[in-house]
Amino acid sequence: MEITVEFFGLPRRLSGVKETTVEVKKGATLRDVVKALAAKFPSFLGDLINPETYELEPPYFFNVNARYVPRSLEYQPKEGERLLLLFVEAGG
């Protein structure tokens, strides 16, 4: 199935694109999406994605359809869902 991922900040700068699509098997988890992103954009490894665990490095996280933030990478996105790869930013 095809999942669209929109990038903001560093992910957008490293990838050179605003968004991309990745192909994953039905029933795939966000971790599978992360692995697909790492394969497509090796520059994500290190700063954005831990190359050993395929966890997103803090402060990065996924938002689903601009409505929901999954608590773990075991969330199974559905066909056609749009993932936003965001980062937590604090200021004063």
What are these regions, as identified by a protein language model?
Residues 1-91:
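Ubiquitin-like/PB1-type beta-grasp interaction modules and other compact soluble beta-rich domains
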